[in-house]
């Protein structure tokens, strides 16, 4: 109670003092002037007192503080609905509310981190680009969480008047408020030019072209993991694989501990979930990764890795050898968000040599194999297999290298900042009267630093689509949300892709606000001569394409090298 009173007093004082013209390096303006830089100036002005006066950072702090208050209020609203109306609601409606509760918790955490950062940053102090990118990423994810909740409510609880009015309407206003906070942060704190990003102290030396040595022989050779002698002996006896004999820290990945999963009982655990639960909470990574080695086998379980299981690395025996499988889907009452066979939210998660599968089939519609809301997550030498909505790159920053993704409708979707590199994208045979869309990117706000980058990948049909003689139309993507952003660059595009390349979502929705681009692709389906002529479609040059590389889009040189996973930092020369 005392903390609540203190917060309210602070909020009241901020109304009195926040907008007094400050003698800083930033100009003081009215809310009308400041709000012109936001997507919804009218709503933006309603956020602030009418006589307010201040610089963009003062407005930004106030908006973030108010966003945090509203996020906490919304969480309490969801709790009330789940407590009072559970027995009266359908399974899908309860599932949508539970998704909202989970997402609201994440959003509150993101807003706390964002507000604490800007609150200690004076008008004369600048944020490093990596820190500014982190906060812009968190605020982008907060908006994504709101939209995910709203989509779920509109789909699963559309017939419930009380939920529509008690949950959806406040959620819409909160989304507008978060958009204001993101816009003002982008205006006030994000540097105009990107600067060199510092690497972790225990990462490998930076190579501006590629990082390939540590895991290059991961699939079949010795593993470059650095651990204690006891842990090494246990691992090698259980896995029957040797670790690299290399005392040079530059060429090894630091490991704090390791456990094994084996269905025959010879490991530490028989299920992946048990192994995940054994991992330490809230580690900072300085001691290395907690490794879970999953031996070959088919694991029929829905795995959820919570946000507190940081720096977790999961290693399998290879694609189609270590398989995690499930069959949740929307037809059977699950939400799209919660249909995932494998779902991860923990930062700095790494998966290697694994297959993630949803076996629901095309007739069950949305059925997710993998959902990642994990910041700074990496998937290397993995496969993702389903039909509609296979891979849900939900939010935050993600990287996929040498992975195979199979699906039909919107089979790579979400609103993360994500780069796919050296991956194989396999459109497969959908249901009758359906078409294939490889991507459905979900950016809802022009200030979100999100999008899908397909770099040096191969797009070709799966075997079942080949046997159908290409009777199904396949597209590079379609705009799920208003500011959808997807780039294909330096990739091989097979003739399976329609000459127009892209498909509408619904009429002219988003055709002027989306950003779809292609750069220097090859293959019989790569010609841009007959591509769509939408205002938002572009054939770009190398300067523009550089914005969507690992180095610039993910700032990957600052965090990816510690994982040992190979990657190309920039464009191919």
Curated annotation (Swiss-Prot):
Top-tier EC class: hydrolase
Pathway(s) it belongs to: Glycan metabolism; pectin degradation; 2-dehydro-3-deoxy-D-gluconate from pectin: step 1/5
Keyword Nuclease: no
EC number in record: 3.1.1.11
Cell location: Secreted, Cell wall
Catalytic activity: [(1->4)-alpha-D-galacturonosyl methyl ester](n) + n H2O = [(1->4)-alpha-D-galacturonosyl](n) + n methanol + n H(+)
GO molecular function terms attached to this record: enzyme inhibitor activity; pectinesterase activity
Site for Transition state stabilizer, residues: 388
NCBIfam families: PME_inhib (TIGR01614)
UniProt family annotation: In the N-terminal section; belongs to the PMEI family. In the C-terminal section; belongs to the pectinesterase family.
Note: The PMEI region may act as an autoinhibitory domain and prevent untimely PME activity during transport.
Name of the protein in its database record: Probable pectinesterase/pectinesterase inhibitor 41
Organism this protein belongs to: Arabidopsis thaliana
């Amino acid at each position: 109670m005392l903390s609540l009173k203190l917060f309210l007093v602070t909020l009241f004082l901020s109304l009195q003092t926040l907008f007094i013209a400050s003698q800083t390096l930033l100009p003081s303006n009215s809310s009308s002037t400041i709000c012109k830089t936001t997507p919804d100036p009218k709503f933006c002005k309603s956020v602030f007192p009418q006589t307010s006066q201040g610089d963009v950072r003062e407005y930004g702090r106030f908006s973030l503080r108010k966003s945090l208050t509203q996020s906490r209020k919304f969480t309490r609203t969801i709790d009330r609905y789940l407590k009072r109306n559970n027995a009266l609601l359908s399974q899908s409606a309860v599932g949508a509310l539970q998704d909202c509760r989970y997402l609201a918790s994440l959003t509150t955490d993101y807003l706390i981190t964002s507000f604490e950062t800007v609150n200690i940053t004076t008008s004369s102090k600048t944020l490093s680009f990596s820190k500014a990118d982190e906060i812009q990423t968190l605020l982008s994810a907060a908006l994504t969480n709101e939209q995910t909740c709203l989509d779920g409510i509109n789909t699963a609880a559309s017939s419930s008047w009380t939920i529509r009015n008690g949950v959806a309407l406040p959620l819409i206003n909160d989304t507008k408020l978060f958009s204001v906070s993101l816009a003002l942060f982008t205006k006030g704190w994000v540097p105009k030019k990107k600067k060199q990003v510092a690497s972790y102290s225990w990462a490998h030396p930076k190579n501006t072209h590629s990082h390939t040595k540590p895991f290059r022989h991961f699939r079949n050779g010795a593993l470059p993991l650095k651990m204690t002698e006891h842990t090494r002996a246990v691992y090698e006896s259980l896995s029957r694989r040797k670790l690299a004999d290399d005392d040079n820290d530059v060429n090894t990945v630091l490991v704090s501990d390791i456990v094994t999963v084996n269905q025959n009982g010879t490991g530490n655990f028989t299920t992946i979930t048990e192994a995940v639960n054994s991992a330490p909470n809230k580690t900072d990574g300085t001691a290395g990764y907690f490794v879970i080695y999953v031996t070959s086998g088919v694991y029929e379980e829905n795995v959820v890795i919570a946000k507190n299981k940081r720096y977790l690395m999961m290693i399998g025996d290879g694609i189609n050898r270590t398989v995690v499988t499930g069959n949740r889907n929307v037809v059977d009452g699950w939400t799209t968000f919660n249909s995932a066979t494998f779902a991860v939210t923990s930062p700095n998660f790494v998966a290697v040599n694994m297959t993630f599968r949803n076996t629901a089939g095309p007739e069950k519609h949305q059925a997710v194999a993998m959902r990642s809301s994990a910041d700074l997550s990496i998937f290397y030498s993995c496969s993702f297999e389903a039909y509609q909505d296979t891979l849900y790159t939900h939010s935050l920053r993600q990287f996929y290298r040498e992975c195979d993704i199979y699906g039909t409708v919107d089979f790579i979707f979400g609103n993360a900042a994500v780069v796919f590199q050296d991956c194989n994208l396999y459109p497969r045979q959908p249901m009758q009267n359906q078409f294939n869309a490889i991507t459905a990117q979900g950016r809802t706000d022009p200030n979100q630093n999100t999008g899908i980058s397909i770099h040096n990948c191969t797009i070709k049909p799966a075997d079942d689509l080949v046997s159908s003689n290409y009777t199904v139309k396949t597209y590079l993507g379609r705009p799920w949300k208003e500011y959808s952003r997807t780039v294909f660059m330096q990739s091989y595009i097979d003739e399976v892709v329609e000459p127009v390349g892209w498909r509408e979502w619904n009429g002219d929705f988003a055709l002027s606000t989306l950003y779809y681009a292609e750069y220097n692709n090859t293959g019989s389906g790569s010609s841009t001569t007959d591509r769509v002529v939408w205002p938002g479609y572009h054939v770009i040059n190398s300067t523009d394409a550089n914005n969507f590389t690992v180095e610039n889009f993910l700032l990957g040189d600052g965090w990816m090298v510690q994982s040992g996973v190979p990657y190309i930092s920039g464009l191919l020369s």
